[in-house]
Amino acid sequence: MASEGVGQNLHDHVLVAGHNFATENKIEQSALHGSVAIVYGKSEISNGVRDLMLNVSTTPSVLPPLQSPDHGFKTTFSFTKPKSRGELRLKDLNPFSQPLIDHNIFSHPDDMRGAMAALNLSREILGAASFDRFGGTEQNQSFLENQAAMRSLIVKGSTFFGHHSGTCRMGAGEDAVVDETLKVRGVEGLYVMDASVIPNISSCPTNALVIAMAELSATKL
């Protein structure tokens, strides 16, 4: 097919790790895959839609070169309504060649503003008096001294949730890869049903959304 939209509109929830508190005493680990609580919030650019997500955990771990204590607690956080868009392209016609992927994260300034809001919310929550009993010491202080340093922490601590979406965008216009029935435009009998058809990613993990879409589409095919 020759649709210019194939592989475009790539986006995901960028997961930022690195806001850690070290404690002298070991904190009991959670059996819930590390997360003991999830916090949702709204940034100043949210337009009323929740766009911040924090995972509070008792298993401190981050990406190098950020400091990770042996004992303590942390948040990993995300701005969940990203505006940056990347692309996924074929390297060549060899099906065994690795694709060319450009996530292009933080190319839209609002995404960094949202991530900064999530970090500030994390600092507000973990710095609250209710956490004093753990005797935690905030780590990575050199990355928290000013706005530029905090942006550096966000960039160095960024990875992905694995909620990649949008590269086979659904829409009513001819520029969309699939139509509202999930049929690929220009290809007879071909349908797509996964997160790639989502035009704009949901503010929550995509698992439930994709399951619901798949159940609905299965009844219509």
What are these regions (language model features)?
Residues 109-113, 201-208, 212:
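Short, conserved micro-motifs enriched in small and acidic residues
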Residues 1-80, 124-129, 148, 152, ...:
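Mid-to-C-terminal "cap/lid" subdomains and adjacent gly/pro-rich loops that border
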Residues 3-4, 93, 195-196:
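Active-site-proximal beta-strand/loop segments in catalytic clefts of secreted hydrolases
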Residues 57-64, 70-135:
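C-terminal segments that line or cap access tunnels to active or ligand-binding sites in enzymes
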